[in-house]
Amino acid sequence: MTQALQALIDQAWEDRTSLSPKSAPNDIREAVANVISQLDSGALRVAEKQGKDWVVNQWIKKAVLLSFRLEDNAPMSAGGFAQFYDKVPTKFANWTGDDFAKAGFRVVPPAVARRGSYIARNAVLMPSYVNIGAYVDEGTMVDTWATVGSCAQIGKNVHLSGGVGIGGVLEPLQANPVIIEDNCFIGARSEVVEGVIIEENSVISMGVYLGQSTKIYDRETGEIHYGRVPAGSVVVAGNLPSKDGKYSLYCAVIVKKVDAQTRAKTSLNDLLRD
């Protein structure tokens, strides 16, 4: 079933310039809708960890992008207090109290999640935004004004602090999604974009900006990483001097490995997830 679905999506992607809301064949519409529905339920995800490596299901990302070609904009209501005009319905538009109870997570107004995003049990969405294709795993808090970009993968027991920006893949078009592994803490107003991977048990201080070209300097070893924060790292914003010493450029600095003191400062509050 999945292989046939993938083949149909891959072919539709090759023919994408000819597709429109009026011209798209029913089989393509149904295939894309199937993928979005499975993303919404967590049955499919854009990236999965296999062993030590993350594998990106590019065909699923293609389906997300194709969905924008298959729908017209339409008015949408948000509980009667606002009107919107978009192609993607909100995830909770038709949910009842029973639906929320069964899903087992909290949504604080006016948090918004788009259809095609997945929110796992015991997660908390403060007034925040979760885009299509994103995966938010169990026990994670998306704090106030944080944004989880399209197709981003957020692990278990992660804390995304206030104003954190997790980049998406749709615009500008990115090959791989941002991945925040289990038990990470991302400090206020930090930005993680361009498919950067934050490995498990890491702590990113407030105001740290990480993209593929950002130097991630380990002060203990002198090693420089790109696009990946090693597991268990504590990272702060810093600068590195140029070779000629005339100027310095922004970098992120791994100052130490996570210890008991760090964990005490960044521990999650189970009372907020009951």
Curated annotation (Swiss-Prot):
Assigned keywords, A-Z: Acyltransferase, Amino-acid biosynthesis, Cytoplasm, Diaminopimelate biosynthesis, Lysine biosynthesis, Repeat, Transferase
Q: Where in the cell is it found?
A: Cytoplasm
One Gene Ontology cellular component annotation?
cytoplasm
Enzyme Commission code: 2.3.1.117
GO BP term (any one): lysine biosynthetic process via diaminopimelate
Q: Kindly tell me the pathway this chain contributes to.
A: Amino-acid biosynthesis; L-lysine biosynthesis via DAP pathway; LL-2,6-diaminopimelate from (S)-tetrahydrodipicolinate (succinylase route): step 1/3
Q: Which residues bind substrate?
A: R106, D143
Family annotation (Gene3D superfamilies) = Hexapeptide repeat proteins, Tetrahydrodipicolinate-N-succinyltransferase, N-terminal domain
So what does this thing catalyse?
A: (S)-2,3,4,5-tetrahydrodipicolinate + succinyl-CoA + H2O = (S)-2-succinylamino-6-oxoheptanedioate + CoA
Xref: InterPro entries: DapD_Trfase_Hexpep_rpt_fam, Hexapep, Hexapep_transf_CS, THP_succinylTrfase_dom1, THP_succinylTrfase_N_sf, Trimer_LpxA-like_sf
Pfam families named in the record: Hexapep_2, THDPS_N_2
What's the top EC group for this one?
Answer: transferase
Task: Name the protein family.
Answer: Belongs to the transferase hexapeptide repeat family.
User: What NCBIfam families has UniProt attached to this entry?
Assistant: dapD, PRK11830.1
Q: How does it assemble?
A: Homotrimer.
Q: What is this protein called?
A: 2,3,4,5-tetrahydropyridine-2,6-dicarboxylate N-succinyltransferase
The protein's organism comes out as Cupriavidus metallidurans (strain ATCC 43123 / DSM 2839 / NBRC 102507 / CH34) (Ralstonia metallidurans)
